[in-house]
């Protein structure tokens, strides 16, 4: 109910926003426009890195969400109420960073924020999986999820704002379309994560996702 009310509120706010008319940058065949957007991304390594980073975040990094019920039940022995609090810790961290970015405007050193945030998110994800398995501390799990929320929002907000500012108006819709498509990969990432969890356990499967995100940020 609360989630539904939140979406209705957001819809009402969006409906009240008035923006000036902008001429469409793409006309004609949608498939051709899609290919043009892909070709534009391929011409710039920075755009490849930024879109690739969002892919790794959605497919590997955020796969931990699908494994959280297993962590809560088997590793932390939590009930529904404690599980809800655990999940909200990451949201609080993300919200805090979003508010800070809102007041900070356009921060410098976005490259450092992107790479550093992704690496630290990956490390935090590995730490969360390992400590849940080896220690089983509820308080520590909350703290690590809060930290993960801080870092993931740090680099994802930096990626989104960088794309918005760097891509010209004529291509922005198509490039941001690919950015949005990467978020749709999150449910697909749950499938290999679940398969890996069967083989090595959910905590270690979560750690593998964190390693993948950090490795891409450092090696790409």
Annotate each predicted stretch with a short phrase.
Residues 19-52:
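Juxtamembrane intracellular "pre-TM" segments in multi-pass secondary transporters
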């Amino acid at each position: 109910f609360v989630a539904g009310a939140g979406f209705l509120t957001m819809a009402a706010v969006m409906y009240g926003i008035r923006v000036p008319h902008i001429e469409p940058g793409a006309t004609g065949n949608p498939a051709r426009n899609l290919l043009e957007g892909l070709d534009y991304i391929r011409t710039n390594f920075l755009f490849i890195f930024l879109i690739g980073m969002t892919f790794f975040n959605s497919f590997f990094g955020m796969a931990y969400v699908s494994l959280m019920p297993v962590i809560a039940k088997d590793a932390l022995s939590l009930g529904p109420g404690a599980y809800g609090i655990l999940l909200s810790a990451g949201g609080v961290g993300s919200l805090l960073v979003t508010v800070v970015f809102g007041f900070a405007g356009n921060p410098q050193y976005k490259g450092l924020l992107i790479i550093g945030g992704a690496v630290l998110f990956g490390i935090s994800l590995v730490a969360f999986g390992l400590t849940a398995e080896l220690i089983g501390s509820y308080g520590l799990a909350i703290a690590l999820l809060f930290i993960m929320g801080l870092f993931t929002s740090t680099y994802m907000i930096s990626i989104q704002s960088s794309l918005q500012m760097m891509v010209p108006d004529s291509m922005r819709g198509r490039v941001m379309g690919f950015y949005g498509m990467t978020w749709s990969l999150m449910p697909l990432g749950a499938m290999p994560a679940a398969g890996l969890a069967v083989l090595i356990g959910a905590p270690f499967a979560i750690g593998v996702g964190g390693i993948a995100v950090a490795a891409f940020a450092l090696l790409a």
